[in-house]
A protein has these predicted regions:
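Bacterial Sec-dependent N-terminal signal peptides
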Residues: 1-37
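Residue-level recognition of well-ordered beta-strand positions that form the cores
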Residues: 24, 123-125, 136-138, 266-268, ...
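Core segments of small alpha/beta cavity-forming domains
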Residues: 36-87, 168-227
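Low-complexity, intrinsically disordered terminal/linker segments enriched in charged
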Residues: 40, 52, 113-119, 128-130, ...
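Surface-exposed, charged secondary-structure patches
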Residues: 75-131, 213, 217-271
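Short beta-strand segments and strand-loop junctions that repeat across beta-rich extracellular domains
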Residues: 134-142, 278-287
Length: 296
């Protein structure tokens, strides 16, 4: 074999050896990285145990509002946080614990149980202070976040029906008649509450501005400023409430009242209370309507 050929053979051998070694090193490094990532990912049960332990202790430690917000946003989606603030305004209790306050040391009885389909039950306390709260988690990157907590009026229920949107199919407002307009407007409006999107307030305002009279829009802001829930920043005169639950949708009713051209809108909430108010569909020059809520 010539010296030149021997040299080329040696170079090829060294190149293949180097390439194989490099690939092996890359695979080893990738495997190590994956192992570290897996080690960093908390199990759902561990995440809930950690979060609820700190949350319960925060009452004794008297966290500032900013500290509570930071703790919640590190462990729940922004949409869930906004939803839970509305539920808090509705029930006058903290939806994370279904109470206004907790006895010191309650975290000692804390238990977390898997229910299936990303649902878990968090329980703590004893006797009259016992709480068992179902909630749902979603995976976000390498961690889990709370994206729904069962409201207390549903007690121990869990499942996708609690997060459903029965009005999701109503995509537009029907202008074919006054009653169709009112019904479809409310289905669209309520659907935005149920969808729990980040831009909820913007979308609700857009619907009010487009489909309500100026007097109704002003009534919305006046009610917000005069009703007790204003302390927590929530009250919507168009639904006579601070939020809407999927289980209330089947009770939504729109029917003519005794007054000409006036319709009664009503529904029953989780406590069995019947909410009622009167509206008109005001004809516009272009053939459309505007919703006019009648003063109480």
């Amino acid at each position: 074999m010539s010296k030149s050929l021997l040299t080329w053979s040696l170079l090829i051998f060294l190149g293949l050896t180097t390439s194989t070694t490099s690939c092996a090193q890359k695979r080893t490094k990738q495997e190590q990285t994956t192992t570290v990532q897996k080690q960093r990912t908390e199990s759902p049960e561990a995440m809930l145990k950690r979060f609820y332990t700190e949350y319960i202790r925060s009452f004794d430690r008297m966290y500032e509002p900013a500290q509570m917000d930071s703790l919640i946003l590190a462990n729940a989606t922004p949409e869930a946080k906004a939803k839970l603030e509305r539920v808090r305004a509705l029930t006058d209790s903290d939806p994370f614990i279904r109470a206004q306050d907790l006895a010191s040391g309650s975290e000692g009885s804390l238990q977390v149980r898997a229910l299936g389909q990303d649902w878990y039950q968090v329980s703590f306390g004893s006797g009259e202070g016992y709480r068992a709260i179902p909630l749902h988690l979603q995976k976000s990157g390498d961690k889990y976040l709370i994206d729904f907590i069962t409201p207390e009026w549903h007690h121990s229920e869990y499942g996708d029906k609690l997060r459903s949107n029965p009005f999701a199919a109503t995509k537009s407002v029907d202008m074919t008649s006054p009653i169709n307009f009112i019904r479809s407007f409310y289905e669209c409006y309520i659907s935005h509450y149920l969808a729990m999107k980040p831009e909820l307030e913007v979308e609700l305002k857009a619907l009010r501005d487009r489909y309500c009279t100026k007097a109704t829009i002003q009534q919305y802001y006046d009610s917000l400023a005069s009703v007790g829930e204003v302390e927590s920043g929530f009250f919507d005169t168009l639904i006579d409430n601070v939020d809407f639950d999927p289980s209330w949708c089947s009770s939504l009713s729109v029917r003519p009242s005794s007054a000409s051209g006036v319709f009664e809108v009503s529904y029953s909430d989780g406590e069995g209370e019947r909410h009622k108010w009167l509206v008109r569909a005001v004809p516009q020059a272009d053939g459309s309507y505007r919703l006019d809520r009648q003063p109480s």
